[in-house]
């Protein structure tokens, strides 16, 4: 059974796959979930090393309308031991097809073969390279191709590449397509959608905020992306909140403070405003355990920052401080005030 047919067979009545659906071989990709290898590269997707595509192009330009099986076998051999992200093929293939004049007959052969591979192949990397190559051809809107991509993209392993292709199509509502897909995928697939989703409505911002607590935000970049797209900075300027809304903001702030050695919050240019507004609101509303946990984390971080400034200040540059000393002391005092009044 092809991967496409496997995905299609497992689509539930709600249009989604089960959350535990997986196509990666656990014996080969033991520590990776579907989509992780590619989506975790989003942080530097526009500055990646580029694959040497000479060998791949040799295979591509052998394609004729009567040798699909032979070409598929060559591609299987080409990707047999491949374990890197497929994204390193994007730019060199985009550049090649964008700069070189290729005959109409060759382009037709390439298009027809790789479109066929989307629904026929049982090889993950052949499907991925097919999406990238089809994307490189600068296609006009094609409803049949779009429907195939939307089915493949339900699996997190293909979501990012599906979104990248959808983004290039013309005469469709791109953001609507990405939003609808985002609501059907999980984890790394959802992260891929949210990264490219334009949050041009309150509905989308609120949805992203709600989803942040449903998914495991596994690293800084994820926490930063969810926080920016949900626009928690803007939300903390409000005076009233929907049920659990403040706690969801707390969860994201906690994630920004807690994850990784290099805290995600340090990369925000509005971190001071964010924490000041958060703590000011926290003093005036009924708090949940999640809120208190976040405030404890802020307190801990401020204590560490104050220690480094007071004990090691002479050895540190000003830009190495999390906040100026007076701001850190102010935030710590507010944290202690809230925690001391805890019921």
What is each PLM-predicted segment?
Residues 179-266:
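Long alpha-helical HEAT/HEAT-like repeat alpha-solenoid scaffolds in very large eukaryotic proteins
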Residues 2-74, 81-96, 106, 227-343:
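Long internal repeat-built scaffold domains in very large eukaryotic proteins
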Residues 113-121, 145-155, 165, 177-185, ...:
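Alpha-solenoid HEAT/Armadillo-like helical repeat scaffolds in large eukaryotic proteins
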Residues 137-142, 172-178, 203-209, 219-220, ...:
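Flexible loop/turn segments at the boundaries of HEAT repeats in alpha-solenoid HEAT proteins
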Residues 91-101, 125-139, 159-170, 190-200, ...:
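Structural detector for internal amphipathic alpha-helices that build alpha-solenoid repeat scaffolds
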Residues 57-127, 131-135, 189, 202-223, ...:
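Eukaryotic alpha-helical solenoid repeat scaffolds
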Residues 121-125, 129, 153, 157, ...:
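Residues within HEAT/ARM-like alpha-solenoid scaffolds
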Residues 96-161, 278, 331-338, 343:
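Well-ordered, non-transmembrane segments within structured domains
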């Amino acid at each position: 059974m092809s991967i496409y047919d496997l995905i299609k067979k497992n689509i539930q009545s709600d249009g989604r796959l089960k959350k535990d659906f997986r196509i990666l071989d656990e014996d080969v990709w033991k520590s990776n979930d579907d989509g992780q290898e590619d989506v975790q590269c989003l942080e530097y997707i526009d500055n990646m090393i580029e694959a040497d595509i000479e060998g791949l192009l040799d295979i591509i330009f052998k394609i004729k309308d009567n040798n699909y099986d032979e070409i598929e076998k060559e591609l299987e051999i080409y990707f047999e031991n491949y374990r890197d992200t497929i994204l390193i093929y994007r730019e060199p293939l985009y550049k090649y097809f964008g700069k070189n004049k290729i005959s109409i007959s060759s382009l037709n052969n390439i298009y027809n073969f790789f479109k066929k591979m989307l629904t026929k192949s049982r090889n993950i990397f052949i499907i991925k390279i097919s999406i990238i190559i089809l994307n490189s051809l600068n296609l006009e809107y094609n409803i049949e191709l779009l429907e195939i991509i939307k089915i493949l993209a339900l699996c997190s392993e293909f979501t990012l590449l599906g979104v990248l292709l959808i983004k290039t199509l013309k005469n469709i509502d791109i953001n609507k397509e990405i939003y609808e897909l985002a609501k059907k995928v999980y984890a790394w697939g959802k992260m891929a959608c949210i990264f490219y989703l334009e949050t041009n409505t309150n509905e989308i911002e609120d949805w992203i905020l709600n989803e942040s607590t449903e998914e495991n935000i596994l690293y800084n970049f994820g926490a930063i992306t969810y926080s920016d797209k949900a626009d928690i900075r803007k939300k903390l300027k409000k005076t009233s909140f929907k049920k659990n809304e403040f706690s969801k903001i707390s969860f994201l702030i906690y994630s920004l403070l807690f994850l990784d050695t290099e805290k995600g919050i340090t990369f925000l240019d509005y971190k001071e405003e964010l924490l000041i507004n958060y703590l000011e609101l926290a003093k005036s509303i009924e708090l949940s355990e999640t809120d208190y946990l976040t405030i404890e984390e802020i307190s801990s971080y401020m204590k560490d920052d104050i220690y480094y400034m007071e004990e090691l200040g002479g050895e540190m540059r000003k830009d190495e401080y999390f906040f100026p000393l007076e701001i850190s002391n102010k935030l710590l005092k507010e944290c202690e005030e809230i925690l001391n009044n805890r019921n």
